[in-house]
Swiss-Prot record:
The lineage of its organism: Bacteria, Pseudomonadati, Pseudomonadota, Alphaproteobacteria, Acetobacterales. This is one of the proteins that bind and probably mediate the attachment of the 5S RNA into the large ribosomal subunit, where it forms part of the central protuberance. GO terms for cellular component: cytosolic large ribosomal subunit. One of its GO terms (molecular function) is structural constituent of ribosome. GO terms for biological process: translation. It comes from the Bacteria. Part of the 50S ribosomal subunit; part of the 5S rRNA/L5/L18/L25 subcomplex. Contacts the 5S and 23S rRNAs. It comes from Granulibacter bethesdensis (strain ATCC BAA-1260 / CGDNIH1). The keyword Ribosomal protein applies. Pfam families: Ribosomal_L18p. This is Large ribosomal subunit protein uL18. Belongs to the universal ribosomal protein uL18 family. Keywords: Ribonucleoprotein, Ribosomal protein, RNA-binding, rRNA-binding.
Length: 119
């Protein structure tokens, strides 16, 4: 299917641009599925995840109606910002993957900025 190939090419192109701009900063990676949204702060130099959050976590599942809306993305953004700062990370590079900066991805990014992450 050509759409999968194009999506993969878009993701790789964006990831290459991020590596050039990163200057040693960790990457805030976003993955969204039909039912949930996930975020990770990844240190590519060390090859390890510094912080992670998702709408699957029990405290968020109890307070959210669903894991697939902008409200859930905002909650995950605030949570990833708290956890990243607890891990000593204050500046990141935002990796939206192959997703447009719109809707849930935008809500997560704005909540992470409000939570104190700089990007």
């Amino acid at each position: 299917m050509p759409s999968i190939d194009l999506q993969e090419r878009r993701k790789q192109r964006l990831r290459f641009q991020l590596r050039a701009k990163a200057n040693g900063r960790p990457r805030l990676s976003v993955f969204r599925s039909g039912r949930h949204i996930y975020a990770q702060v990844i240190d590519d130099a060390a090859g390890r995840t510094l912080a992670a959050a998702s709408s699957l976590e029990k405290p968020l599942r109890e307070q959210l109606r669903t894991g697939a809306d902008r409200e859930a993305a905002s909650a995950v953004g605030k949570l990833i910002a708290e956890r990243a700062q607890a891990a000593g990370v204050s500046a990141v590079v935002f990796d939206r993957g192959s997703y447009l900066y719109h809707g849930r991805v935008k809500a997560l990014a704005e909540a992470a900025r409000e939570g104190g992450l700089a990007f």
